Amino acid sequence: MSNPSLLILPGDGIGPEVMAEVRKIIGWFGDKRGLNFDVSEDLVGGAAYDVHGVPLADETMAKAQEADAVLLGAVGGPKYDDLDFSVKPERGLLRLRKEMDLFSNLRPAQCFDALADFSSLKKDIVAGLDIMIVRELTSGVYFGEPRGIFEEGNERVGINTQRYTESEIERVARSAFELAMRRSKKLCSMEKANVMESGILWREVVTRVAKDYPEVELSHMYADNGAMQLVRAPKQFDVILTDNLFGDILSDCAAMLTGSLGMLPSASLGAPMANGRPKALYEPVHGSAPDIAGQGKANPIACILSFAMALRYSFDQGAEADRLEAAVEQVLADGVRTADLLGTEGVTPVSTTEMGAAILAKLDASL
């Protein structure tokens, strides 16, 4: 039986630095746990533009379509600001999402106890927080037609169209319910059914899909109230399902409850392939951070936790994902911190590679 395949796309800025630490951890799982991957590496974003003149080569896209999972570092940087929109680094990432049809975006917001003081909210509100936001990623107002800026009478008008089909809602809803079954069997769907027809349809479809998951406790909430509740009492939620626009806003809101974007992974999942695994792209939430690139200051944890998500959702290795996540939590509990997490007494400042080494040491200790 062949090893599962993993395509690595380090990208730009701090991407190569944080990905280097992930490569070491991938190697550890092969050496110590017999969990081997066929790993290949290619270019994306500005790095691809510098070589190929496009932010994602066709050959790389083909590799991504064939891989069991894709792990991406970060894309973009000021060097590419003046490029035509069609070849900006971010277009490489957008092409991956579009052509792989990655419709279900998973954004965890977990607050490690050791970092609760970094949240802008009181410690007792966020300590132990563990939310998963499932955002529909390929439809809705960002993609609906008609769209554009047009002349109408004596002035211009900007138009965007919120559009969802039943099938688009159903597939992301099923993704969220399946996820809820893995977790606490609790799901809150957020929309604006009080003022938007797309929200009415969304609620109807989600309610219908819920009948196939009787073990999951389903609730509905208007998205504006959901944003307020995320700040007021975030631990009332477990899995949150929402559309593209509201998911964009709510996931960023939830992210800041945790204290640092350098900690947050994400997954974008598509339909199952022939082998039963979903097409999948994993990436940290943070950007390319060109201001600290090459200085050893980058926090590799978000990228490492993105690999943990790949272990869980693409490779059915939930126990090994737990092992890796526990190693990260133990390192943080020991007071080991990269530059983005300094600011409290009794911590040990470390570089990117030192953080990776500390996590590897905890993995060794877990055996």
UniProtKB/Swiss-Prot annotation:
GO terms for biological process: L-leucine biosynthetic process. It is found in: Cytoplasm. It catalyses: (2R,3S)-3-isopropylmalate + NAD(+) = 4-methyl-2-oxopentanoate + CO2 + NADH. Its main location: cytoplasm. Binds 1 Mg(2+) or Mn(2+) ion per subunit. The keyword Magnesium applies. One of its GO terms (cellular component) is cytosol. Substrate binds at R97, R107, R135, D224. NAD(+) binds at residues 77-90, 287-299. Pathway: Amino-acid biosynthesis; L-leucine biosynthesis; L-leucine from 3-methyl-2-oxobutanoate: step 3/4. Its EC number is 1.1.1.85. Keywords: Amino-acid biosynthesis, Branched-chain amino acid biosynthesis, Cytoplasm, Leucine biosynthesis, Magnesium, Manganese, Metal-binding, NAD, Oxidoreductase. The record marks Y142, K192 as: Important for catalysis. Mg(2+) binds at D224, D248, D252. NCBIfam families: leuB. Homodimer. PANTHER family: 3-ISOPROPYLMALATE DEHYDROGENASE. Belongs to the isocitrate and isopropylmalate dehydrogenases family. LeuB type 1 subfamily. This is 3-isopropylmalate dehydrogenase. It comes from Ruegeria pomeroyi (strain ATCC 700808 / DSM 15171 / DSS-3).
